[in-house]
């Protein structure tokens, strides 16, 4: 049976003691709850494979068996913290939709489900047997009725618990200082990602914040006063480390629908209503879309079909309610593929090919007829041709968004140049109403002034669709602009396309004209017919000084255009040539770096997609919390950088953004999966060295090693690293240092696979189809190389050697160990990297690097190889090296006393009514208030004496 990837052990799961428990009161007693914070790995002496480290709510941190030696010390109480969710399932007791965590389904009653909390609180009939579903994809496990079974009370961090800062605390003095207690007021989920994974805590000073209790495997709190969290049936919880069996899944090839398919619902309303029960539900408005054509947006976890009918309307349908027709329908906008030879081949028997069709290649057209045999009549390039559906692709306007910007700019420039030429060539009557525009186009200030004096009412008359002020702004004629403004020209008057004079100044790259118009009070954020402001226009044209002038005068840098792109989105799309514009925009104080365009890309996503390193760095400096933000498909900035081979961007996200390198998208792919999938050889060592798990699996159960062996491109040779990507050369050098064939002998897939095996990837790991990397390495030479790399990794682990690359790991609190694995003999003397003396090197924890001698290690706070904070320094005999004494500082008692005095002083001068402003008015009784509060009072709020006089003070 295939294991369910979400049912495997993951950090963040909440656990209780299990059937093989033999560790006394480490959990605080039966019913104590803990969080899985670390997974065991091959070769580790304290946390070997199939073990976990648990942070108990009451503070102990210890490792336990999760299948190791056949024992299971723990039971899984809740997996909502890792994002487990059952879409379209409603708890029939508490009515929560999209049930989180394990699902409990009654075997007696029809379609009756409970969430974990309701099941454990004895909701529904106790004599009824239930099925347990660990995840949405796992097979049900039949359980005995709850009647007569013992229930164990839960204790730990629940609502009402008293807590202090815990092992993963990184929130400064939000709690009021070390050891200050707070009270848990709520347990909730983190946005839509996870459930019951954070606690809302109110501290002694009255402030309330949210802290992690399982979210991403972190625990910010320690329980000092337990609270009751309900009950659990020990016999009904799954053993941690024994994955649930996966339901038989239909392969993608046999799915009736795929993303992008055109579908219709042709059923009667009553039939559709019945079919929708349990498959997205029924809404009366769905009847309006019966018979209409929609597009398959996605397939849900349960196999239901999400259909989009227009820009705003999506419905979830039972797959049996939909009918799939031709790929394209009359009225669909399509693009003809651009490859001539391919089109000729595909057209055989489908309308055939003539040379007259060549202008249609790569062009966008519209389907005007669908023939019975599936061929399509398409209007394109002024003609109508019959095409095979294989020659067409669905046209998405967003694909050409950047092209549209450039095309519009060229069209604007071209049309303006033609208009100016026509104006200058005009030989109209001097008294013609549009003569003023001609004189401005010719730069004749004296004649323009004369016309303004004689005919001031003609100041806004148009010629060639433009006013004199618009032409002067485009040409940068500052003197004429001032004359026209003095004559009360319409500064915000638009042309036929909605462009104002400010737009024209931006189009003409005229920063001084821009400043003059802004000083005259023009609308800085006026939009044209494409929803673009002058700032959009200047950014799209790459005019740095105009952008600077607009930003200096307070233009709104957050307004979106027709594609929902802000000016910074457009600047990022322009590439490194617009770096100066990016710098100017990101320095604007009120810029919204969380802005999202119509494709769901935040600015950080967009910069990562385009590989704009400067923009990524600037955005992270403003809002580092966005580094792990996900799009609708689960992609983060690091996913996008990995997918598009932007190595520098990935480095910035990892080193400066401190992103989660093991984050998953909706297909459970990590950034390493994507880099390997796209054969981006240079990114693989970077991600692995940053701590990306080499054994993480996607929704198909494939690890990066499985994916690598499906890539067959020849490995690019990197002879000179000058100015190039050092990643491929780094990967090759590591392979060669291990005695493996070099670049001339391996394909990309084989080279990456060997590298991953050297870094600890499991060559025997089976995916959901039951295939391991060794099964995929069909070629004997590759199979032999892969086995050799795996053997080298095992030898290195057995010998206690360091990893071949500087693996970055986050430091963790000290862990008490229950389990010990025999270690190899201690290391011999080696050269210290600092003083170059031959000595026994000190082992740094947690990174496990040996780089310096004892004398040099004393003052080190970070490992010089991987820059990870050192929590322990161990001699070869296991004794700890004392760190150098810190410089003397003020006694802690003195610091706390001063802080207390400061708070008292602050309280004495703060208004007791609004508790916001300082006291500005003092009453005759000696008490006081701020001016707004004190003016409205008739009696003192403290002593209740009537107020006869108010004395204003200045603090």
From Swiss-Prot:
The lineage of its organism: Eukaryota, Metazoa, Chordata, Craniata, Vertebrata. Residues 1-80, 149-227 form the MIB/HERC2 domain. Expressed in skeletal muscle, and to a lesser extent in heart, brain and kidney. E3 ubiquitin-protein ligase that mediates ubiquitination of Delta receptors, which act as ligands of Notch proteins. Positively regulates the Delta-mediated Notch signaling by ubiquitinating the intracellular domain of Delta, leading to endocytosis of Delta receptors. PROSITE patterns: ANK_REP_REGION (PS50297), ANK_REPEAT (PS50088), MIB_HERC2 (PS51416), ZF_RING_2 (PS50089), ZF_ZZ_1 (PS01357), ZF_ZZ_2 (PS50135). Zn(2+) 1 binds at residues 91, 94, 115, 118. Keywords: Acetylation, Actin-binding, ANK repeat, Cytoplasm, Endosome, Metal-binding, Notch signaling pathway, Phosphoprotein, Repeat, Transferase, Ubl conjugation, Ubl conjugation pathway, Zinc, Zinc-finger. ANK repeats lie at residues 464-493, 497-526, 530-559, 563-595, 599-628, 633-663, 667-696, 700-728, 769-798. Its EC number is 2.3.2.27. One of its GO terms (cellular component) is cytosol. It catalyses: S-ubiquitinyl-[E2 ubiquitin-conjugating enzyme]-L-cysteine + [acceptor protein]-L-lysine = [E2 ubiquitin-conjugating enzyme]-L-cysteine + N(6)-ubiquitinyl-[acceptor protein]-L-lysine. It holds the Pfam family ZZ. The modification Phosphoserine is found at residue 251. InterPro entries: Ankyrin_rpt, Ankyrin_rpt-contain_sf, MIB1/2_ZZ, Mib_Herc2, Mib_Herc2_sf, SH3_15, Znf_RING, Znf_RING/FYVE/PHD. This is E3 ubiquitin-protein ligase MIB2. Ubiquitinated. Possibly via autoubiquitination.
């Amino acid at each position: 049976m295939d294991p369910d990837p979400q049912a495997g052990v993951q950090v963040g799961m909440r656990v209780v003691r299990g059937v093989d428990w033999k560790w006394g009161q480490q959990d605080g007693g039966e019913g104590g709850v803990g969080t899985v914070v670390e997974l065991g790995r091959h070769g580790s002496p304290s946390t070997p494979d199939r073990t976990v480290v648990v942070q108990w709510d009451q503070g102990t941190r210890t490792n336990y068996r999760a299948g190791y030696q056949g024992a299971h010390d723990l039971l899984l109480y809740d997996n909502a913290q890792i994002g487990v969710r059952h879409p379209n399932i409603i708890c029939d007791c508490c009515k929560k939709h999209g049930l989180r965590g394990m699902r409990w389904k009654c075997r007696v009653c029809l379609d009756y489900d409970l969430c974990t909390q309701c099941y454990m609180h004895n909701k529904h009939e106790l004599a009824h047997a239930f099925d347990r579903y660990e995840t949405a994809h796992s097979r049900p496990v039949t359980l005995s009725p709850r009647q007569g079974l013992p229930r164990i009370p839960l204790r730990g961090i629940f609502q009402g618990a008293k807590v202090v800062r815990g092992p993963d605390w990184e929130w400064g003095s939000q709690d009021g200082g070390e050891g200050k207690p707070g009270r848990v007021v709520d347990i909730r989920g983190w946005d839509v990602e996870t459930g019951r994974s954070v606690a809302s805590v109110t501290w002694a000073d009255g402030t309330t914040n949210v802290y992690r209790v399982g979210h991403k495997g972190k625990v910010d709190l320690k329980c000092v006063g337990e609270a009751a969290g309900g009950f659990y049936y020990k016999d009904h919880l799954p053993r941690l480390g024994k994955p649930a069996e996966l339901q038989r899944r239909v392969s993608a090839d046999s799915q009736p629908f795929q993303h992008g398919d055109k579908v219709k619902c042709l059923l009667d309303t009553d039939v559709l209503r019945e079919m929708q029960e349990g498959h997205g539900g029924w809404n009366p408005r769905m009847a309006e879309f019966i018979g209409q054509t929609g597009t398959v947006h996605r397939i849900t976890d349960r196999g239901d079909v999400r259909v989009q009918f227009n820009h705003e309307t999506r419905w979830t349908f039972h797959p049996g309610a939909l009918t799939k027709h031709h790929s394209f329908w009359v009225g669909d906008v399509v693009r003809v593929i651009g490859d001539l030879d391919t089109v000729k081949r595909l057209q055989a028997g489908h309308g055939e090919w003539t040379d007259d069709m060549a202008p249609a290649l790569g062009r966008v057209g519209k389907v005007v007829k669908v023939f019975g045999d599936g061929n399509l009549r398409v209007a394109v390039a002024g003609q109508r041709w019959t095409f095979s559906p294989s020659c067409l692709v669905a046209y998405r306007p967003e694909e050409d968004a950047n092209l549209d910007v450039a095309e519009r700019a060229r069209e604007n420039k071209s049309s303006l140049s033609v208009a100016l030429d026509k104006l200058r060539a005009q030989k109209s009557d001097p008294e013609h109403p549009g003569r003023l525009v001609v004189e401005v186009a010719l730069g004749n200030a004296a004649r323009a002034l004369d016309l303004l004096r004689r005919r001031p009412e003609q100041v806004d008359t148009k010629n060639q669709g433009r006013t004199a002020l618009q032409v002067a702004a485009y040409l940068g004629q500052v003197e004429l602009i001032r004359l026209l403004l003095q004559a009360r020209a319409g500064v915000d008057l638009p042309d036929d396309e909605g462009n104002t004079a400010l737009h024209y100044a931006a189009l003409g790259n005229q920063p001084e004209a821009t400043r003059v118009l802004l000083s005259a009070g023009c609308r800085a954020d006026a939009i044209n017919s494409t929803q673009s402001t002058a700032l959009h226009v200047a950014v799209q044209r790459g005019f740095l000084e105009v952008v600077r002038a607009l930003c200096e005068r307070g233009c709104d840098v957050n307004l979106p255009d027709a594609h929902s792109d802000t000016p910074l989105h457009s600047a990022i799309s322009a590439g490194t040539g617009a770096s100066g514009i990016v710098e100017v925009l990101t320095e604007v104080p009120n810029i919204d770096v969380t802005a999202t365009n119509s494709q769901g890309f935040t600015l950080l996503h967009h910069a990562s997609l385009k590989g704009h390193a400067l923009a990524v760095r600037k955005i992270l400096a403003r809002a580092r919390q966005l580094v792990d933000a996900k799009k609708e498909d689960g992609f983060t900035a690091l996913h996008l950088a990995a997918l598009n081979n932007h190595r520098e961007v990935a480095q910035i996200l990892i080193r400066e953004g401190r992103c989660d390198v093991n984050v998953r998208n909706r297909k459970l792919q990590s950034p390493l999966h994507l880099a390997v999938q796209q054969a981006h050889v240079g990114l693989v060592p970077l991600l692995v060295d940053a701590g990306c798990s080499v054994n993480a699996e996607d929704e198909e159960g494939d690890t990066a090693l499985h994916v690598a062996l499906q890539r067959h491109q020849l490995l690019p040779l990197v002879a000179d690293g000058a100015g190039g990507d050092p990643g491929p050369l780094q990967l090759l050098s590591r392979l060669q240092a291990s005695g493996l064939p070099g670049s001339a002998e391996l394909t990309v897939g084989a080279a990456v696979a060997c590298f991953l095996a050297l870094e600890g990837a499991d060559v025997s790991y089976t995916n959901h189809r039951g295939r391991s990397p060794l099964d995929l390495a069909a070629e004997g030479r590759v199979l032999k190389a892969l086995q050799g790399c795996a053997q080298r990794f095992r030898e290195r682990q057995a010998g206690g050697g360091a990893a071949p690359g500087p693996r970055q790991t986050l430091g963790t609190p000290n862990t008490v160990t229950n389990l010990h694995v025999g270690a190899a003999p201690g290391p011999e003397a080696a050269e210290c990297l600092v003083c170059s003396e031959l000595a026994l090197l000190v082992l740094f924890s947690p990174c496990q690097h040996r780089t310096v001698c004892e004398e040099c290690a004393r003052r080190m706070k970070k490992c010089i190889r991987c820059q990870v904070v050192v929590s322990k320094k161990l001699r070869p005999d296991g004794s700890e090296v004392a760190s150098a004494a810190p410089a003397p500082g003020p006694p802690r008692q003195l610091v706390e006393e001063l802080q207390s005095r400061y708070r008292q002083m602050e309280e004495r001068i703060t208004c007791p009514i609004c508790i916001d402003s300082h006291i500005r008015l003092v009453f005759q009784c000696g008490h006081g208030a701020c001016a707004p509060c004190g003016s409205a009072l008739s009696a003192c709020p403290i002593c209740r004496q009537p107020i006869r006089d108010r004395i204003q003070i200045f603090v």
